[in-house]
A protein has these predicted regions:
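Conserved active-site alpha-helix within GNAT-family acetyltransferase domains
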Residues: 103, 115, 127-145
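Conserved GNAT acetyl-CoA-binding A-motif
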Residues: 113-125
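Acetyl-CoA-dependent GNAT
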Residues: 4-6, 11, 18-19, 26-82, ...
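Loop/helix-junction capping segments adjacent to catalytic residues or to phosphate/diphosphate-binding pockets
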Residues: 34, 99, 130
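Terminal substrate-recognition subdomain of acyl/acetyltransferases
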Residues: 1-6, 124, 137-157
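Amphipathic alpha-helical recognition patches that constitute DNA-binding helices
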Residues: 23, 86, 131, 148
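Conserved acetyl-CoA-binding loop-helix of GNAT-fold acetyltransferases
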Residues: 92, 98-111, 138
Length: 157
């Protein structure tokens, strides 16, 4: 799965490791302003230890983690009979943005999913995240005919 940056012309793409947590938290903090140590610890634990199929990837340049994709594979959720990969985190160090890191990660993920015979990859994006929406659109993602519903628990009653 690992790609050699000298032969592939880009970052080395590899599976994420538990030791990547601090770097993920630091990259996310620089972007979001939030420190989500517990969130990333849980996410990595589920991705690395609890998942039947491990699809989360990291991108390295010169031995430093500069980007990551976190996701999972679901079987039969929400009435879908076929397996579906879910991409829930795309993270690239700001200093390495717009250098093809996210694209390289996504290309490797798609290659891996095809090898697993998983035919669809889904993600959700906030409507105001225009840069991320643009990236996904350029990568071939399109809206699906599904309606996501939400209820504020405090308003229920």
């Amino acid at each position: 799965m690992d790609r050699d940056p000298l032969t592939a012309g880009g970052p080395t793409i590899r599976t994420l490791r538990a030791a990547d947590c601090a770097r993920l938290v630091a990259m996310d903090h620089a972007i979001s302003g939030r420190k989500r140590q517990a969130w990333y610890e849980g996410k990595l634990r589920r991705a690395l230890s609890e998942a039947d199929v491990k699809i989360s990837l990291g991108a390295e340049l010169d031995g430093m983690l500069v980007g990551a994709l976190l996701g999972s594979v679901h079987y039969g959720e929400f009435g879908q009979p076929e397996p579906l990969a879910i991409l829930d985190t795309v993270l690239v160090d700001r200093e390495f943005a717009r250098r093809g890191i996210a694209r390289a990660l996504l290309d490797q993920l798609l290659f891996n999913l095809a090898g697993l015979r998983i035919e669809r990859l889904r993600t959700e994006v906030a409507w105001n995240e225009q840069e991320l929406i643009g990236f996904f659109a350029r990568s071939g993602f399109a809206p699906v005919p599904r309606l996501v519903l939400e209820l504020a628990v405090s308003a229920a009653g």
